[in-house]
Structures are given as structure tokens and as C-alpha cells.
């Protein structure tokens, strides 16, 4: 199901048909370095991973979405996540290396912000990012998000930067 469209992009719900793309994205060295190793090494692992976003659509009315160009080429994922460890919804995104530095993440994230504000009526949005991920930090700042504090996820010892923006 298509959720959002921008000038260049379509954001749609992930499906089990997206296993090959998810397998490639989650094994990209930058994904593993900056976001984390999800231990997705096979098509079956990718199917299991995809159940998370699919269940989030049903439970929350949002989740991580596939980002495609107008030709239908998968570029990355972007969307909204509700984590038990955070007080508010956060935004997440990741793109294949060949589609970075072309403004796609900014465009997809901007559309996700508008969805969070206008459709979900959220007043605040968070983002968590590795302190070493300079490109992602610059993107969050360009989107108007402000650094609030360092944050550690439960069951993880890596400190992350927590960013926030008021949408209302």
C-alpha cells in the first residue's frame, strides 16, 4: 500500500516480497556500522525481519516504509518507529550506498515528518543516531531536529545521540 508520494519518491508499506532488498540493505557495511547488525543473513532471516514493520502497520498505523523512485526502483527505507524505550515516536532511515547523497533521505524524511504531524497528529518526533554517523547527524539538523542528550538503548551499551523536534 502506498503511504506517501513526493516529487521523486513513493513510500509504501514493506511486504514479504521485499526480502532480497532487505537482505542487501541490512548487510551493507555502513548499515551494520552505524545502525547495527540485525543478523539477517538469509532470505528466511529477511522474512522474519520484515514481520516487525508489517506488524507495526497493523498495531500503530505506521512503521518503516520502502522508498522507491518513480520507476519503482527500491532505494532505501524510511519511516516512523514506536519503541518501548523511547517516550515518543522516532524516525528511521537507511539507503543503499548508490542512492546516498542525492537528497532522497531528506525528501523521504520530510514526507514522514508531514505524515507524523498531519495524519498521526504527533506533536513531537525523535531520532537516535550513532555519534560517529556524521552524515545522518547533518541530515537530522537540516530537518530542524535538535540534539537533546546522549541515550543508551536497553540491553545495549552503545551511547547514541537523541535528537528531537516539536511538530506543532
Model-derived regions, located:
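Acyl-donor (CoA/ACP) binding surface of acyl/acetyltransferases
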Residues: 1-34, 51, 66-168
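Short glycine-enriched, charge-decorated loop/helix-capping segments at active-site entrances
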Residues: 37-40
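Short amphipathic alpha-helix in the helical subdomain of ABC transporter nucleotide-binding domains
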Residues: 42-46
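A short helix-loop-beta-strand connector motif used in the catalytic cores of GNAT acetyltransferases and
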Residues: 54-66
